[in-house]
Amino acid sequence: MFQNADDVKKFIADEDVKFVDVRFCDLPGVMQHFTLPATAFDPDAEQAFDGSSIRGFQAIHESDMSLRPDLSTARVDPFRRDKTLNINFFIHDPITGEQYSRDPRNVAKKAEAYLASTGIADTAFFGPEAEFYVFDSVRFATRENESFYHIDSEAGAWNTGALEDNRGYKVRYKGGYFPVPPVDHFADLRAEISLELERSGLQVERQHHEVGTAGQAEINYKFNTLLAAADDLQLFKYIVKNVAWKNGKTATFMPKPIFGDNGSGMHVHQSLWSGGEPLFYDEQGYAGLSDTARYYIGGILKHAPSLLAFTNPTVNSYHRLVPGFEAPVNLVYSQRNRSAAMRIPITGSNPKAKRVEFRAPDASGNPYLAFSALLLAGLDGIKNKIEPAEPIDKDLYELAPEEHANVAQVPTSLGAVLDRLEADHEFLLQGDVFTPDLIETWIDFKRANEIAPLQLRPHPHEFEMYFDV
């Protein structure tokens, strides 16, 4: 939106901007913010903050950190009462001035620089498709003597027998793709989200109800370069959640909020370009893929068990990655085939449209780290000419047992992928994009803050199974 500090100053004055919202991303992937009066904001100055209070950052004895604005990300916040300009910032060490190695946006910036340094390509495009659910209410608690969650939605299949205000037209389990209103209760809400996305600079391509009951949705927008695509995804999630909130609803990108129905994934489309020319197309190759694209796929599939520590980084992620709910649990590639973890979309003979789609990820993690890790895995495949296993152009869910035994599967838990990341991360260290410190911090944080707390607590379903032993 802006190219320099003078542009920002002029906009603030001309548009009577009242506040500037300073935004940055914590290590797990949630945007943080504090707000300055616009009169106190100097786009040439750094902002200080306490890094020890941010998840995954600094210890208390070295807590001071500084923020530098990325003025290209400035957007007017559509939800604040007083006119507010949101700006994403990079994090730096206040003493050395160096980029902070645990700043997710700095990781993405380094990934783009490393790509250019390889000579393989100069641009990587990423197009995430993040699914989400919209509920009317959610209640949950975990205490010493109880643990529960309760979701409700006027469109939920479980409400067909509800007594109050029941006019039918509930979405059946796995029945949400693509019925028209009134079965689709959320067409207007998605339209409102889409218009807000457009006003914020994202180019919406389509929106629809997804397969799941209770308002599962997908809104697709145009791809972007790596760092910008991660920024776009954070903006997308912010707008989805706030439009839902404004309408008395609540939106979640949790991978598996509902037992017995489809989870919410985030298919990630990717392509490499050099000098304005696409590198993934060859009309003679399988599915129109070039050797470069095939090796890129080989790298991602080889490293997928460790990659999932960034692309599917929550305990809940692995409730989605199970057979039977259209989740891509098979680590193979194929054209058109949605049962494969890596799909080659049919794009005709247009070289510029050729891309690969990694279908395993979800939106519960940090997009800056996830996209950077995917790029580095793909580049490792290109540099080392890693051949993927032969493509499988049949329904992988219906393979005979002897065939299925030869198909690699995604790991089944967060603990398993963290173990794999611990053993397989050399490809992430190339170009100093990820550092050993970041990887160690990520693994330790996930084990201590997500795996260990669940190991300490009995699950409610255990009472169904074991109370009367």
Swiss-Prot record:
GO terms for biological process: glutamine biosynthetic process; nitrogen utilization. It is an enzyme of class 6 (ligase). The modification O-AMP-tyrosine is found at residue 397. Residues 15-96 form the GS beta-grasp domain. InterPro entries: Gln_synt_N, Gln_synt_N_sf, Gln_synth/guanido_kin_cat_dom, Gln_synth_cat_dom, Gln_synth_gly_rich_site, Gln_synth_I, Gln_synth_I_adenylation_site, Gln_synth_N_conserv_site. The activity of this enzyme could be controlled by adenylation under conditions of abundant glutamine. The keyword Ligase applies. ATP binds at residues 205, 221-223, 269-271, 338, 343, 352. Disruption phenotype: Grows on defined Evans agar supplemented with ammonium chloride as a sole nitrogen source. However, double deletion mutant glnA/glnII is not able to grow on this medium and is auxotrophic for glutamine, indicating that both encode glutamine synthetases. It comes from the Bacteria. Its EC number is 6.3.1.2. L-glutamate binds at residues 262-263, 320, 326, 338, 359. SUPFAM superfamilies: Glutamine synthetase, N-terminal domain, Glutamine synthetase/guanido kinase. One of its GO terms (molecular function) is glutamine synthetase activity. Its cofactor is Mg(2+). It is found in: Cytoplasm. NCBIfam families: GlnA. Oligomer of 12 subunits arranged in the form of two hexagons. Belongs to the glutamine synthetase family. This is Glutamine synthetase. The lineage of its organism: Bacteria, Bacillati, Actinomycetota, Actinomycetes, Kitasatosporales.
